[in-house]
Structures are given as structure tokens and as C-alpha cells.
């Protein structure tokens, strides 16, 4: 028996050895256990089970006449009623499609017309632009020619021999000089000649003899009392030749009233001037013969009363009475009035 076993082993060893790659692998993969094979079978079965696609009918096909007359709001139940509803839907769709096509056609026509108009306008603007460019080039050339001619004329024009005197500019120095105060001694005042003024009215024609202590006299002192004399009449150079009686003769009450107050009657005198000067005191009643300049003294040297005796019309202050010094009702107590008449003696 042992011999048989040895023979068997030797026979097995004597068999040719098979490569390992030829040995079948007895393993189970996860793909073999999946359900992909079943899905493939179902996919293969589905196309066969699908219903054939509904064939769309051609446009313009005549529709059959519906067999029923179902109201619009009633639900279709029978096959004839359903066919009626289908025919109604087709008719509505055809009408809507026709309306849509017509609307699109009108819109397209409108757009085409606008396109044509814009093309024409664009063409016109291009032509206008070309014309303006040509005009601009022509004007630019003319401007260049004129500029060249002007430069040539300036170059050929000779320069003047003596340049124009430059006008003085406004500098702060000029303004400062204008602001400086000019003294009165440097201001020239024209002195008119005494021959130009020939007064026709003299104080001697107005003066009358009266009591000196009872009637006020004409004051020749200044309004401010600064000692400067302001005579009422311009005597000029005749002051040296006339007597002092003509100069210092006092005025009477009548003359005084006629000169400064006018007539005291109820009816106003038409010959009285606004400042109280009566026209009847003038020679011939002519106002033009009595210039106002005769009231002003243009002598450079003021006339003083130092050389005039007080007995000829200007009494001494000590001889005046206290009652005559008191001003009248309404008169100023501080200074004389504008006519140069003293409030008192």
C-alpha cells in the first residue's frame, strides 16, 4: 500500500506545472451583486412601452363641424362635446396667432420706416458736415492771409518820431497830495475891481436925523463878535472922501420898519421884498439898479469904527439905557440876527 502511495505522489510530481496566471480566481466582486443588470433591462423595455408622439396637424387644415352645441360654461362629458371644445380651442388659437402676426407685421413696418428716415437724416447730416468743414477750411485760409497782411503792414509802417506823452498814472502819492489840506493863504481869491460895483443906493439917502438914545443904529460888527467888521453897504474907495456923517448916520423907525418889517398896515404892501427891503427906497423903484454885491465889502482891509466919532450915530455904550438894551419879544438873547442888526443899542 505504501508503494501505491509513493507511485501516486511520483505521478503528481511528474505532471507539468501550470502558470499562476492560468489559475482561475474564485473571488466575488461587488459589481456582480449590484442591480445594474436589472436597470439595463428596464431601460431596454421602456422605449418599447412608450406611446408614439402625437403628430401635429398642418396649418390651415379644415376642422370638422362639431356635432354638439355645448354652452360655453358647461363641462364637456361626452366625446362629441370634447371634440367641440377642441375645435373651439383651435379656432381661438388661430385667431390669436393671426392677431399676433398682424401686430408684429405693423411693428416691423414702423421700424423699417423709422430706419429709412434715420438713414436719410444721417445722410443729410453727413453732407452738411462736409459743407461746414469745407467752409471752415476756407475761412481759416482767409484768416491766415489777413493775419499775414496785417503783420506785413505793421512791418512796413514807420515808427512815429516822437512818442506820445504817457499819461500820468494814478499813484498813491497823487491821492495823498489830493488829501492834503491846502492852507487858505495859498488859495487865490479873485478880487473884483471897485469900479465894477457902483451902488446906486447910499446910506445917506436912507438916514434921517433922530434921537440916538431912543432908536437903534445899524451894527457893522460881525455876527460872531470876533472884532471883524462887516459893513452893510460897500463904500469902496469913497469911504475916504465922504464925510463920517454919511457912514454912521442912524436909521429912523420908519426906515427900519420899511427895511426889515415892512408896512404894519392890515393890507400887505406888494412892494416889500422877502427880506424886508422896500422897493420905494430905491431910485425909480428899479430892483435891477440895486445889486446885491453892493451889500458886500470886497476890500481886503475891513472897515473899522476906530476913527469914527461916537456922536455921529454910534453912541457910547455907557450912554445907553438899560431898557434899550433889552431885546424885544421873540428876539435872540445870545447873538444878532442874520441882517446884522443888534438886539440892543
Swiss-Prot record:
Pfam families: bZIP_2. GO terms for molecular function: DNA binding; DNA-binding transcription factor activity, RNA polymerase II-specific. Induction: By the unfolded protein response pathway. Accumulation of unfolded proteins in the ER leads to splicing of the hacA precursor mRNA to produce the mature form. Residues 83-146 form the bZIP domain. Keywords: Activator, DNA-binding, Nucleus, Transcription, Transcription regulation, Unfolded protein response. GO terms for cellular component: nucleus. Residues 30-40, 192-210 have a biased composition (Polar residues). Belongs to the bZIP family. PANTHER family: TRANSCRIPTIONAL ACTIVATOR HAC1. This is Transcriptional activator hacA. It comes from Aspergillus oryzae (strain ATCC 42149 / RIB 40).
Amino acid at each position: 500500500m505504501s508503494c501505491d502511495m509513493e507511485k501516486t505522489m511520483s505521478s503528481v510530481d511528474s505532471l507539468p506545472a501550470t502558470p499562476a496566471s492560468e489559475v482561475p480566481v474564485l473571488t466575488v466582486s461587488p459589481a456582480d451583486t449590484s442591480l445594474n443588470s436589472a436597470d439595463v433591462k428596464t431601460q431596454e423595455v421602456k422605449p418599447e412601452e412608450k406611446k408614439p408622439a402625437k403628430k401635429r396637424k398642418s396649418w390651415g387644415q379644415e376642422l370638422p363641424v362639431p356635432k354638439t352645441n355645448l354652452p360655453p360654461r358647461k363641462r364637456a362629458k361626452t366625446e362629441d362635446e370634447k371634440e367641440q371644445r377642441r375645435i373651439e380651442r383651435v379656432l381661438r388659437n388661430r385667431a390669436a396667432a393671426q392677431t399676433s402676426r398682424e401686430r408684429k407685421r405693423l411693428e416691423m413696418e414702423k421700424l423699417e420706416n423709422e430706419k429709412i428716415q434715420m438713414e436719410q437724416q444721417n445722410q443729410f447730416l453727413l453732407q452738411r458736415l462736409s459743407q461746414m468743414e469745407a467752409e471752415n477750411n476756407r475761412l481759416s485760409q482767409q484768416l491766415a492771409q489777413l493775419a499775414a497782411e496785417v503783420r506785413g503792414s505793421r512791418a512796413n509802417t514807420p515808427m512815429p518820431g516822437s512818442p506820445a506823452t504817457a499819461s500820468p498814472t494814478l499813484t498813491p502819492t497823487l491821492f495823498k497830495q489830493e488829501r492834503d489840506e491846502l492852507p487858505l493863504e495859498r488859495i487865490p481869491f479873485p478880487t473884483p475891481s471897485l469900479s465894477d460895483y457902483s451902488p446906486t443906493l447910499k446910506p445917506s439917502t436912507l438916514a434921517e436925523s433922530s434921537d440916538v438914545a431912543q432908536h437903534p443904529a445899524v451894527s457893522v460888527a460881525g455876527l460872531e463878535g470876533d472884532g471883524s467888521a462887516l459893513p452893510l453897504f460897500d463904500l469902496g474907495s469913497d469911504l475916504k472922501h465922504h464925510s463920517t456923517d454919511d457912514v454912521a448916520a442912524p436909521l429912523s423907525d420908519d426906515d427900519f420898519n420899511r427895511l426889515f418889517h415892512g408896512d404894519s398896515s392890515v393890507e400887505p404892501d406888494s412892494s416889500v421884498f422877502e427880506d424886508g427891503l422896500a422897493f420905494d427906497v430905491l431910485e425909480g423903484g428899479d430892483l435891477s439898479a440895486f445889486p446885491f454885491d453892493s451889500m458886500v465889502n470886497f476890500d481886503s482891509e475891513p472897515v473899522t469904527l476906530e476913527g469914527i466919532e461916537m456922536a455921529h450915530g454910534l453912541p457910547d455904550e455907557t450912554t445907553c439905557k438899560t431898557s434899550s438894551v433889552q431885546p424885544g419879544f421873540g428876539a435872540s438873547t445870545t447873538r444878532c440876527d442874520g441882517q446884522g442888526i443888534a438886539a440892543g443899542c
